[in-house]
């Protein structure tokens, strides 16, 4: 009896169940497959829970970075601004489906806010960049979630400006989970390291900086003894293009230094050299004021090119001081002091021989022995005016003592006065010749010292310039 009742109830309910199933099937075929799939995936989905069925299994997040542009390098604040293409994917075990049940759909884009997303950040972030908002992610039917987005990254970087403008900077972008340990979230590299390093396919290579490579590096670190975290570093290596700074900074400084060296060929006994070098010094000072805003400045270091400018300024000051010294030396005839013997020997013989100027530095003063011999030969003539009294006691010049015998005693005293005037004129001329000879000696000494200081100055400038050029060449092609 009971069996008969059950069969009767089944016979009555079967048409109703078949009708309901047919109605549900008709409704499912009329709804779009994307809506049905979205409802299937997101219904009862808990985005606050890590998407694994076994909590002991870590979620592996694969990441990739492609540098698109170097926007700004702020040496003063030690900040690097880059524009990158960031890609990451992970497996969400709660977002899987059979494509045959949903019109062979193999991937779907859904809002990022609707699913679980790993908390991977860049440790060096110092400011929020102006990145476009990409609100969707791609999901494949195996549960693979792909998150692609461009990022404007403003990060802290230790910038070394000592080699400016031939500097190479190495800044890191460190991706790590802010909260989860490696037992929960592990990080891996999407592509091979060689491909990441040499990928410049989208880099805008028209700016001041040249991308040398992106070097990935993975490590595990611990902030506490029991908790380890995974991090992926990308070292962005960039090099500055120095052509603009060479043209606007180095070449004007080199031209001014060359003009200072050429200024040594002006005569040392003229005042034009002093005024010329003062003009160069003032011009270089104005040049430094103009380029001061171009040079990078930090609180912890100064670029070598700044030291180069300071040394060039010091060399110009030394050159001006040397010129003033030489001009003062060659105008020393006002003091009426002859060149000391030791200075004559040192400068006109030793230094002149060293500089191959010995023949030009030999004094042309007539020997004093001939004049003394002439005086001795004429001394026997006697002083004929000594018997006439009065002005005859003045000193007689060698020409007077060699003059013919005086006229008779009754000659006029005017003759002796005339001889006395002639003697005074001769003494004046001899004194003037002596002063001129002293001036010529000091001029020879000044010329030799000027040549010596010029060679020393030239060697210092060349040695300093060659050293800097070698250093900058090594840094440029390192």
Swiss-Prot record:
Q: Where is this region: HA-stretch?
A: 414-450
Instruction: Indicate yes or no for the key word Membrane.
Output: yes
A GO BP entry is:
monoatomic ion transmembrane transport
Q: Which InterPro entries match?
A: 5HT3_rcpt, 5HT3_rcpt_A, LGIC_TM_5-HT3, Neur_chan_lig-bd, Neur_chan_lig-bd_sf, Neur_channel, Neuro-gated_channel_TM_sf, Neuro_actylchol_rec
- Pfam families per the UniProt record, alphabetical: Neur_chan_LBD, Neur_chan_memb
Instruction: Give the range the annotation lists for the signal sequence.
Output: 1-23
Listed PROSITE patterns = NEUROTR_ION_CHANNEL
UniProt-annotated location(s): Postsynaptic cell membrane; Cell membrane
Q: Which residues form a coiled coil?
A: none
Q: Name one GO cellular component term.
A: postsynaptic membrane
Which segments sit on the Extracellular face? 24-241, 293-302, 476-478
Task: Report the glycosylation sites.
Answer: 28, 104, 170, 186
**MF annotations from Gene Ontology:** excitatory extracellular ligand-gated monoatomic ion channel activity; identical protein binding; ligand-gated monoatomic ion channel activity involved in regulation of presynaptic membrane potential; serotonin binding; serotonin-gated monoatomic cation channel activity; transmitter-gated monoatomic ion channel activity involved in regulation of postsynaptic membrane potential
Q: Which reaction does it catalyse?
A: Na(+)(in) = Na(+)(out); K(+)(in) = K(+)(out); Ca(2+)(in) = Ca(2+)(out); Mg(2+)(in) = Mg(2+)(out)
Segments of skewed composition (Basic and acidic residues): 393-402
Subunit architecture = Forms homopentameric as well as heteropentameric serotonin-activated cation-selective channel complexes with HTR3B or HTR3C or HTR3D or HTR3E. The homomeric complex is functional but exhibits low conductance with modified voltage dependence, and decreased agonist and antagonist affinity. Heteropentameric complexes display properties which resemble that of neuronal serotonin-activated channels in vivo. Interacts with RIC3.
The entry's family comment says:
Belongs to the ligand-gated ion channel (TC 1.A.9) family. 5-hydroxytryptamine receptor (TC 1.A.9.2) subfamily. HTR3A sub-subfamily.
Domain comment? The HA-stretch region of HTR3A seems to be responsible for the low conductance of HTR3A homomers compared to that of HTR3A/HTR3B heteromers.
Can you name this protein?
A: 5-hydroxytryptamine receptor 3A
């Amino acid at each position: 009896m009971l069996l008969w009742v059950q069969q009767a109830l089944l016979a009555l309910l079967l048409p109703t169940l078949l009708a309901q199933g047919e109605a549900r099937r008709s409704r499912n075929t009329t709804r779009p497959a994307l809506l049905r799939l979205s409802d299937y995936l997101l219904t009862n989905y808990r985005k606050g829970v890590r998407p694994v069925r076994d909590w002991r299994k870590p979620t592996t997040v694969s990441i990739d970075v492609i540098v698109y542009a170097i926007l700004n390098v702020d040496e003063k604040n030690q900040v690097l601004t880059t524009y990158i293409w960031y890609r990451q994917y992970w497996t969400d075990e709660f977002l899987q489906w059979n494509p045959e049940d949903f019109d062979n759909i193999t991937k779907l884009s859904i809002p990022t806010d609707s699913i679980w997303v790993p908390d991977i950040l860049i440790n060096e972030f110092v400011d929020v960049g102006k990145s476009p908002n990409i609100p969707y992610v791609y999901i494949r039917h195996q549960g693979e979630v792909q998150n692609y987005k461009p990022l404007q990254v403003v990060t802290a970087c230790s910038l070394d400006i000592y080699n400016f403008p031939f500097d190479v900077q190495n800044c890191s972008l460190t991706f790590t989970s802010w909260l989860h340990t490696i037992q929960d979230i592990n990080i891996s590299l999407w592509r091979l390291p060689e491909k990441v390093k040499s990928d410049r396919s989208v880099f805008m290579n028209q700016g001041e900086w040249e991308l040398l490579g992106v070097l990935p590096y993975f490590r595990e670190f611990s902030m506490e003894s029991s908790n380890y975290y995974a991090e992926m570093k990308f070292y962005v290596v960039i090099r500055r293009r120095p052509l603009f700074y060479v043209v606007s900074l180095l070449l004007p400084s080199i031209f001014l230094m060359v003009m200072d060296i050429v200024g040594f060929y002006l005569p040392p006994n003229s005042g034009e050299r002093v005024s010329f070098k003062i003009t160069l010094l003032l011009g270089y000072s104005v040049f430094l004021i103009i380029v001061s805003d171009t040079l990078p400045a930090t609180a912890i270091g100064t670029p070598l090119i700044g030291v180069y400018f300071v040394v060039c300024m010091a060399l110009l000051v030394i050159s001006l001081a040397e010129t003033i010294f030489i001009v003062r030396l060659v105008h020393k005839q006002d003091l009426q002091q002859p060149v000391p013997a030791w200075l004559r020997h040192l400068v006109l013989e030793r230094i002149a021989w060293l500089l191959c100027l010995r023949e030009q530095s030999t004094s042309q003063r007539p020997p004093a022995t001939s004049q003394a011999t002439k005086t001795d030969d004429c001394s026997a003539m006697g002083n004929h005016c000594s018997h006439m009294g009065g002005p005859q006691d003045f000193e007689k010049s060698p020409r007077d003592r060699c003059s013919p015998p005086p006229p008779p005693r009754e000659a006029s005293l005017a003759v002796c006065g005339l001889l006395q005037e002639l003697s005074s004129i001769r003494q004046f001329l001899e004194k003037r010749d002596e002063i001129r000879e002293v001036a010529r000696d000091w001029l020879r000494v000044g010329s030799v010292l000027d040549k010596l200081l010029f060679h020393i100055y030239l060697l210092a400038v060349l040695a300093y310039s060659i050293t800097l050029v070698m250093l900058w060449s090594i840094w440029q092609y390192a």
